[in-house]
Amino acid sequence: MVYEIIDGFVQAIQLIVSLNPEVVTITVLTIIVSLTSTFLSAIISVPAGAYIYAHDFFGKRLVINIIQTLYALPTVLAGLLLFLFLSHQGPLGFLDFLFTPQGMILAQMILVTPLIIGLTITALSGIDKDMRHSIISLGATKFQAIVTLIQEARFAILAAVILGFGRAISEVGAAMIIGGNIRAFPGDILSGTRVLTTAISLETSQGDFPLAIALGLILLGVAIVVNVGLNMIQSGSLWKNSWNS
């Protein structure tokens, strides 16, 4: 059994090094879907988080609690609910997003958006109160003050976006339900919906361990890159704070 495992890893590395077409297709589609969903989520989430932070309104605490609860939204549940909406009988059936990369992007956005909103609120709340008062006392409008605070908290907000990307790329439940794990046609990456996580699940169940291991190693590599990026951002933030002090 040990020799079979070793042989599986050897074959997996060969698949990666030789740029196996299926491995490349699955990896590229995964990155496209996850980057797109994270980018779109960030465009929505950062302004939304800043708005919630800067305004006092009835039920604000409840809204924040709901957002934080959605951090742990089960991916299978998110996929099921979105499936009902995107099915032909559902209210969003006219979009024809079911079993498409667009549908997977939408599913990942549902999972990532609350995370980035909540962490944006937390990042802005961590700014020194004296700085907030100083910005307002200098005559800045509320919009200008919010923009300045976002710039001040940019390291923490960027870290939130990277964490969102990590959640998106490691998601499997919603991707399986909404995407259907469809293999792409040769030469047309966007014709399929098979991403790293769903492909690993499929290949493992079919006994193709070398391919599953190869995809798993790539997913692990992405996780390492995300972690290194977070550490670099945190180091930059600490250096900035120590320099200012």
Pin down the residues of each PLM region:
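C-terminal transmembrane helix and the adjacent membrane-cytosol boundary/short C-terminal tail
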Residues: 121-129, 136, 147-148, 209-245
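Transmembrane helix boundary and interhelical loop/hinge segments in multi-pass membrane proteins
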Residues: 122-133, 142, 154, 169, ...
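Membrane-interfacial helix termini and adjacent extracytoplasmic/periplasmic loops
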Residues: 2-21, 78-109, 179-190
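Transmembrane alpha-helices
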Residues: 119-120, 142-177
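Interhelical loop and adjacent transmembrane-helix boundary motif
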Residues: 18, 176-224
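Hydrophobic alpha-helical transmembrane segments of multipass integral membrane proteins
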Residues: 32-44, 48, 74, 154, ...
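Transmembrane-helix boundary motif in ABC transporter permease subunits
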Residues: 36-67, 142-145, 149-150, 229-232
